[in-house]
Amino acid sequence: MLKGIHKYLLMCFGTVLFTVQANAARIMSNNPIKEDWQCKVVDGEWSCKRAKKPKSVFDKKLTKTEKEKALADDLAWVKKPSYFVGGYYSNDSQFTKALCESKKTDLSYEKSEFDNDGTLIASGNVQVLQCDQELYGNNAIINLNSNNSAIRSLVMAGDVIVKQPSTGIVIRTTELDADMNDGTYSTGEAYFRLAREMPKTRIYDKEHFSGYLRGYAKTFKKESSGDIVLSDGYITSGDPYDNAWKITGNNIDIDTNTHMAYVKNGYFEIQDIPVMYIPYFSHPIDDRRRSGFLYPGFVQNANSGIGISVPYYFNLAPNYDLMLQSVIWSQRGIMENGTFRYMTKYFQGQFEGSLVPYDFKEGKMRGSFTLSTTGQYENINTNFKYEYVSDQNYYNDFSAGNVNLVTKTLLDREFDLTYTNDYVDSGLTVLDYGVVNPLLTVDNTPYAKLPEVKLNLTSDGYTPDYLTLSAQTLNTFFYKTAGPANTNPGAPQGTNVNAFRAYESPKIAFNFNKTWGYLNPSLEVPIRYYQLKNSPTDTIQFANSSVTSVLPIFNIDAGAYFDKDYTNENGTYTSTLHPRLFYTYIPYQDQTNIPLFDTSLQNEQYMQMFQVNRFTGYDRINNANQLTYALEASTTNQEDGTTLASAKIGQMAYFADRKVNLCQGNSACPNPGLMDPFSTDTFSPIMTSFEFQVMKNIYLSAQVNYRVKQQNVDYQVYQLSYKDENENIFNVSYNNIANNWSSLTQQQIAEGAKPQPQETITLSTILNITDHWGIAALWNYNFQQKQIANIFAGLQYNAKSWAVRALWQKTAYTNQDPNNPTLLGPLVNTYMFEFELKGLGGIGNTSDISSRLQQINGYQVGEWGDGI
C-alpha cells in the first residue's frame, strides 16, 4: 500500500505516463463528483472552504426539480437565459488537450493499494485523463498490462462520469467496466447525451436547439463492433429541464457504423404519458442518409379528400437510394409514390413515380412518372428526361395544389448529348412533347426536334485578343403530329408544316478593350435554309417548299468607365459611371414565307436594347437601323464587393420602321402593323432598371418603361424585399405590362391576336413573431381577371425539442384550358399539417409545406425545419 502525503509512483514506459497521487486531492472543478474548493478574496487574502458534494441523480429521494438540476450538472449543461433553450452543453477539453500532444495518461486519486497480481485499487476522487477522454469515479480497480506500461482494463464505481469532448458524449452512471484494449465498456443505470448534427437554420441554431440527443438506460453497453446497446431506456432531444417528449424502448441499439438508432418495443410519450405504442422505430444520429421511417404527413384537398402519408427512406448504397411513400386518400384510395436516385462516376439521375392502383372515384388505375438523368465524362455531357401521366386530370387530383403541376400542359421528353472545349461547342438534341390535355390544338403544341445538331466554333486562343472569328451551325428537323385544328368542340384534326431548317452564321468581331472603356464592332451573316413538307391539312399554308434567307448583321458596342473612390464612416466605396452606345444595322427582308418553329417576340426591357434581334429563336430576324444610348451608374463596397445601388437608363432611336413581324403564310395577320402598334415610332420607350439597398436588410428593384409619345408607362415591375438576421422576410412585387407578348400562344399569333395586358401583385412574408411562433403567407392577385391566383397562410409553433406547422392554400388551376394558359381556373382548397421532433429528422424527406414556402423570395429550405 502506498501511504503518505505527496508520494508519487512514476511509471514511464514509451509514451504512457501514470502520475499517482496519494492522499492529495486537487483543487480542480473539472471532477464533477468530488467536493470542490470554493475560494474568494477576503480582506486581500484567499478564503477557501469545501463546497457541498453535488447531489446524485440516482438518489430516489430527490424531488423532480432537484433531479433535473443534478442531471443538468452531470451532463455539463450551462444555463444561459438569453438562449431560447435556456443554455448549452459544455465540452471543455482544457484538461485533456495537452495529453493529445504528449500521448500520456494522467491518473490521480486520494488513496490506493496494489494487489498481489499488480492490480491497482484506487479510491477517493479517482480521475483518469487521456487524449479526448475523461473518466471520473469514487473508486476504481485498474488492471495494468504485463509490464505496467498501460491500463488494460478498469472498473469504476460510485458516482461515475465518462466524457469525450470531441464528440460531445457524456455518460453518468453508477458503475463502469471498461476494456481499454478494444474500447468496449458496459455500465449500470446510466444517463447520457450524444451530439446530433443539424442544419444551420434559425430553429436549429445553438440558441433554439441544444443540438443533442439525451437519454437513460438501465444498462449501457458498447460492443467491440462499436455499437451501443441500451436496455429499458429512452431518448429525447430536450435539454435536462425539458421532458416534453420521449421515445422509450426495451431495446435501443445505436449502430455507429451506419449511424442509426433502432428502438424496439417502446412508446412515444408526451410529458411522461404514453400516447402511442411503437413496435419498431429507427432514426439517424447524424446528417448522413440512413434508412428509416420519416415524418408522416397530413394533407386535405378538395379533389381527393384527406390524405395521410407514411414515407420510408431506403439508403440502399452510398451512391443510390429509394424513397417510398404510401398515401391513403379518403376519396381516392391508396396511392404509392416512389423516388429512386442514383449516382455513379459519370452519371446521376432519378426516377419519380406515383401509382393509384384503383381510384375509387374514377374506377381505374392512374399514375405518372418522370425519369431524368445527366452524365459527364471529361468534355462530354448528356441529359435525358421523360415524363408520363395517365390522364389529363391526374395532376389536378393528386398534386394537392402544387403550382408546378396544376399549371402543367406539356410533358417533356428530351435527350441531349454535347461536347465542349475552349474552341468547340457541339451537340445533338432529340426533343418531343407529350400532351396532358388532348384539347390542346395543333398550333399550340410545340414542335418536336427530331433531331437537332449544333456545331459552334471560335478562334479564341488562336487569334489576337482583339480579334474573334466564330461560326454557329444549327440544323434541325421539326416534326409535329396531328391535333385539333381549333378550340371548338369536335374540331377536325389538323396539321402544321414539318420542315428541315439549316442555320449557319459566320461572325467576325473586334475587341478593343481598355480599363477605361471598350469598342467592339462585329459583322455576322446568318444564312437560313428551309425545306418544307407542306400538306393540305396544314392549318397555315405556305406557297413555297423551300426558302433561303441571307441577312448581314452589323453591330458596334462601345462604352467608357469613370470610377471614383470615396470613404465615409461606413466604409470605402467605388462609384462607377458607364455611358454606353449600341448600334445595329440589319436590312429588311420579308420573312412571312418562313414558318414559326421556335420563335416569339420579347417584351421590351432594358437589357433587350443590347440585343441585335428582338425575336427569340431563329425564324425571324428584325430589320434594324437603330442606336441605343444608355447610362449606367453603380456604387460598390470595396470590402465585400456588394453593390449598394445601381441605376440604368436608356433609349433606342430608330432610323427605320420595324417591318418584320410574326405573320406567317396565309395566317390572319396581313397587316404588318397589326402585331406591333409601335413599329413606326422614332423612339423606343425610355427603359430603366434600378436596384437599391434602401437601408440594412431592405432592397428595392424596379424596371420601368415610359413611352414619351404616348405619355404612359407600359411596362413596370417592382420588387421590395426585406430579410433580417432572424430570417424575417417581407416581399411586395407588382407587375403591370401593357402588352404582354410572352403570353401569346402560337394559335393567337396565327390569328393575329393582340397581346393582352398583365397586372398582378404578390405579397409574401415569413415572420418569426416570437421564438415560439412564426407565420408564413403569400397572396397573389390578378387584376385583369379580378381573381386570386394563389394564396396560402402557414403557422409554425417552435418548441425547444419539437415543432408543429400547418398550412392552408387556395390555388387556381390554370391548366383547365390548355389553349389559354393565362386563364385562371377555379380555386381549390388544400390543408397541410406536419409534426417534427427535433433531432429525429428523416434525411431525404420532402416537405409539402416547404415546397410552398419556396415561392416566397428569400426563403431557404430548412428555415422552418423542413427537409431535415
Curated annotation (Swiss-Prot):
Similarity section: Belongs to the LptD family.
Assembly: Component of the lipopolysaccharide transport and assembly complex. Interacts with LptE and LptA.
Designated name of the protein: LPS-assembly protein LptD
Record keywords: Cell outer membrane, Membrane, Signal
GO biological process per UniProt: Gram-negative-bacterium-type cell outer membrane assembly; lipopolysaccharide transport
Gene Ontology cellular component list: cell outer membrane; transporter complex
Record HAMAP family: LPS_assembly_LptD (MF_01411)
Extent of the signal sequence: 1-24
Superkingdom, natural source: Bacteria
Organism encoding this protein: Francisella tularensis subsp. novicida (strain U112)
Pfam families referenced in this protein's UniProt entry, alphabetically: LptD, LptD_N
Database matches in InterPro entries: LipoPS_assembly_LptD, LptD, LptD_C, OstA-like_N
Function text: Together with LptE, is involved in the assembly of lipopolysaccharide (LPS) at the surface of the outer membrane.
Localization per record: Cell outer membrane
